[in-house]
Amino acid sequence: MGDMGDPPKKKRLISLCVGCGNQIHDQYILRVSPDLEWHAACLKCAECNQYLDESCTCFVRDGKTYCKRDYIRLYGIKCAKCSIGFSKNDFVMRARSKVYHIECFRCVACSRQLIPGDEFALREDGLFCRADHDVVERASLGAGDPLSPLHPARPLQMAAEPISARQPALRPHVHKQPEKTTRVRTVLNEKQLHTLRTCYAANPRPDALMKEQLVEMTGLSPRVIRVWFQNKRCKDKKRSIMMKQLQQQQPNDKTNIQGMTGTPMVAASPERHDGGLQANPVEVQSYQPPWKVLSDFALQSDIDQPAFQQLVNFSEGGPGSNSTGSEVASMSSQLPDTPNSMVASPIEA
């Protein structure tokens, strides 16, 4: 009965090593996401037998562990031409599900490097530029080997801009009906877009002559140019309709944020701040105390000034006065320079 009051003991979890299948009694357990546990001596690369710990990256595939180098070598994406892998800083060219280095993206017939905007065809034996693709197609038709209706002529594609090797590839669209060809999406480069936008700004509806000039300037097909102008006009029309709707809703549009209602405002241009004070301006003048004027007057060295001469004459001509100008000068030199030197003396009764 006494044992019933004891707290229940927690069940100890048992860790089993995925590598050897034995129980792990070590102090440290290496756990690989999500729930795989290993002995420190059992977690190693299946190819090079390098020990894997928390300081390196571990990859698991089909129950086997690999280091980063061997995993990329075995299962990483490789160039369809040279069969060499890509680094994280490489830019690649994609053609359907195949990936190429920029230097390897060449025609197999003439070895000309395909740049963004060039049309090419992807066949079983590699990439072909448009000229060599037409030669191969004419040769196959001239040899009396007509194409099967289930395998129509391969459509030409247009090379897009190079992208980073780390960017995931887009899944190609799969048609259920085999007799339909896949529509190729045309990707324009910056020079082609600049030419089309400049022409559109001058005339949104170019005539046939202008379209022919655009074909020569951009190297695009007439169909691509026609579709681009149609899409551009449609986008601008939708944008103008949306702007009109926003302008109509703006007078009645109010924003309510956490119970506070406000009217949207548009920031204007900055302007100079006038202050807007109601008080009148006050003119501030410098104030000079009287003792400073007297002290400056006494320290003047030029005795020929009229004010000083007048003071001397007054002292000489005054009744009962025997003082001279030198005495006046000596008395004036005894005047204090600053008010701090003035000390009040008691008055004798």
UniProtKB/Swiss-Prot annotation:
Induction comment: Down-regulated by beta-catenin/CTNNB1 in mesenchymal stem cells (at protein level). The down-regulation probably proceeds through ubiquitination by WWP1 E3 ubiquitin ligase and protein degradation.
PTM (free text): Ubiquitinated probably by WWP1 E3 ubiquitin ligase; ubiquitination is followed by protein degradation. Isoform 1 is phosphorylated.
Gene Ontology CC terms: chromatin; cytoplasm; nucleoplasm; nucleus; transcription regulator complex
DNA-binding region: 181-240
Spans annotated as LIM-binding domain (LID): 262-291
One Pfam family of this chain: LIM
Alphabetized Gene3D superfamilies for the sequence: Cysteine Rich Protein (2.10.110.10), Homeodomain-like (1.10.10.60)
UniProt entry keywords in alphabetical sequence: Activator, Developmental protein, Differentiation, DNA-binding, Homeobox, LIM domain, Metal-binding, Nucleus, Phosphoprotein, Repeat, Transcription, Transcription regulation, Ubl conjugation, Zinc
Subunit record text: At neuronal promoters, displaces LDB1 from LHX3 LIM domain to form a ternary complex in which ISL1 contacts both LHX3 and LDB1; allosteric structural changes in the DNA binding domain of LHX3, induced by the ISL1:LHX3 interaction, may explain differences in sequence specificity of the different complexes. Interacts with LHX3. Interacts (via C-terminus) with POU4F2 (via C-terminus) isoform 1. Interacts with POU3F2. Interacts with POU4F3. Interacts (via N-terminal domain) with MLIP; the interaction represses ISL1 transactivator activity. Interacts with GCN5/KAT2A.
Protein name, as recorded: Insulin gene enhancer protein ISL-1
